[in-house]
Amino acid sequence: MRLVVPYLGEIHPVDRRLVRLAEFLGIDCLTIPLDKSAGAAPEFLERAIALREACFVVNPCVLQGWLGGDTLPVALSSFLVTHFPHLLIHSPRLETFDSSLINLLSRGHLQAVRTIGQSERFYDISPESRDICDPFAGLSFGPTNHVNDQVFSIGHEGPELLKLISIAGQPFMAALQRDKSKIWFLAGQDVADLDAEIGDAPVSEYFSRLLPHAMALRCIFGEESWRPLKQYASVIIDDPLLRRNYGFLNFESLLALMKQRNFHSTIAFIPHNFRRSSPEITRMFRHNTERFSLCFHGNDHTGAEFASNDAALLNTLLWIAEQRMERHNKITGLHCDRAMVFPQGNFSLEAMAVLRVHNFDGAVNTVPYPMHDRVRLTLRDIAQPAVLRYESFPLFLRKDSVHTQSADIAFNCFFGRPVLVVEHHDVFQHPETLADAATRINTVAPNTCWSNVGAALRNSVLEKCTPDGIHHIRAYSNTVQVSNRSSSVKQFSIEWNQRSHPEQVLQDERQPVTFAADGMGIHLDAALPAGSSRTFSLVHQNPYSEFGDLGLRRKTKAYVRRRLSEVRDNYLSKTPRVLAAAKKLQRSLPR
């Protein structure tokens, strides 16, 4: 099936943005030039569009420019609802023609659009809309966008009219089955530009220009559009030593809380501390792998250590960190996921490149840009599992508990982003803050798989199936597991949208497989027997030299910083005035 977009002269800007969104979702599009001199509209469209399996886009401005007049011809209305299985009506205006079109195609269920008032502040998503609105179903949030948002006036109610998204009880997004056609009505004036910079804007700021269109398109095209395979989540707690108590954190209490509220905690572990883990707590981790795990948190956790532009230094730091965590594994039996959480949220482009050639699965960060290049992310960057603009290495974003609200969770789930929650020991002074965030995640996405952060990164993939029966997998992490859960052999096409090319791709960590690489990314094909799984990993060659010995001064600085940080977390943090004075003193010292 294809999305058919008619145009007059040139594609209308709002339709062009819709096409870009559809293509971003993996949907095939066909643009059709309209001819004013072609005679009767139905006959022209039937000649011009041979496809029967299509979704026809109805932009009232375009149709009126083609047809003229103030009303939609009845003959054209009848043709549309009997010829196309889906109609997508969007960007209606406060015009007589638009009112005629809406009224005629909806059989009077909907009439004209109107702008919303200042008091109409919330989007209410129908609880019965999960098959269309996915994790947004049942949510209510705002504020609405008074520049973009309009609502339909209701002519007469009826069970056949589905009010999917409403503002103050009036439909903003609706659907209706008529004859052979499912008709989708979107009241927003505009479609979001995927390449527009949005920075850290809240979901509500761009929701009405992006999500209703994406919801409709994904529902219309089903498995032929990109969609998440499964939803993953993990709480990441930065810094603590693996001892019974660290600051306000008590691991026994955390385990009880995780069991009560159903979540998983990944400890962002500082490799410098590899000799200092308590046997009692490492035993607890080994016996509760479904609740506890580890990932990398820098090397020494010195100030901005991974924001350096010196690739040789970064290469050395990573080599030391890996050696330390291998020794920690031998001492404790605990595996450390190959995911990097940057200390203080600071990183450089060079750090991303070095992580890539060390074959890490990905980086996780709260700050979405390099320390020395404060770019603003676009909708395209955030409407997929990971940000790929930094040296083609995946950056997975996280938020703290307070900022992990229901709309943020739903956005992540809709676009396949793992829900990663960041906290430090001090959240356990009031642990209900974290517990409530876990409950919100489990409420919005009840089928969430709580896991270690490594599994969350590796399994946050998109999939679609094309009419030829090939299952397409778009991977973001360095490693991806592909499963055939059917009872027959299936063909898979696996892709990474990375500009940097690996030396080889390994199947199940040992067998090289044939792959293709070009300017668009990395591709390979695989046939999987029924009920089987395969793991595919990119293996990069490391071209960087090592820095050599880091020197006594750096080692001493790292040692002192770690001990002072522990004094701060274990003692000063429990005396606010002393902690404030210590932080002031810390800021005055050279880094």
Description of each model-found segment:
Residues 1-52, 258, 267:
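Aromatic-Pro/Gly-enriched surface loop or interdomain linker
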Residues 47, 200-290, 337:
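Active-site beta->alpha N-cap acidic-glycine motif
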Residues 79-82, 88-103, 111-115, 264-355, ...:
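Metal-dependent polysaccharide deacetylase catalytic core of the NodB/CE4 family, i.e.
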Residues 218-221, 225-229, 253-273, 360-379, ...:
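C-terminal domain-boundary segment and adjacent tail
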Residues 218-249, 258, 330-341, 345-347, ...:
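Catalytic grooves of carbohydrate-active enzymes
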